[in-house]
Amino acid sequence: MEIINLTEGAFDAAVAQGVTLVDFWATWCGPCKMMGTILEQQVVPQLEGVDARICKVNVDDSPALAARFEVLSIPTLLFFKDGALAARMEDVQTPETVVGKVKELIS
């Protein structure tokens, strides 16, 4: 599984089908870096073979997306199922919490 960097133009198509986790972050955000490391090193390996996607949206590069989903603090994780927002988590999360939510949405 590879983490996909999304822009505004590609967002809707990326979340349209299946389960998609989107990490809203910024380069200057310390907790975002921690969450990014957790996603890359712990969540991705646990979700290998699972029918889901993990994407990232830089809020500085895509402020309209952050506004659209009322992302007021970062990191914010949004979970989509077939294009609909299904769950939201703010601040740094444990890998178990993130993986658990993805698997819950798949079942």
Model-derived regions, located:
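Conserved redox-active cysteine motifs that mediate thiol-disulfide chemistry
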Residues: 24-38
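Structural micro-motif
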Residues: 63, 69-78
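Structural microenvironment flanking redox-active thiols in thiol-disulfide oxidoreductases
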Residues: 57-65
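N-terminal "domain-start" segment that seeds a small globular fold
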Residues: 1-13
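Conserved Rossmann-like nucleotide-binding pocket used by diverse enzymes
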Residues: 2, 25, 55
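Conserved helix-turn-beta segment immediately C-terminal to the redox Cys motif
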Residues: 19, 36-57
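Short active-site neighborhood of thiol/selenol oxidoreductases, capturing the structured segment around
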Residues: 15-25
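Non-catalytic, surface beta->alpha helical segment in thiol-disulfide oxidoreductase systems
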Residues: 81-107
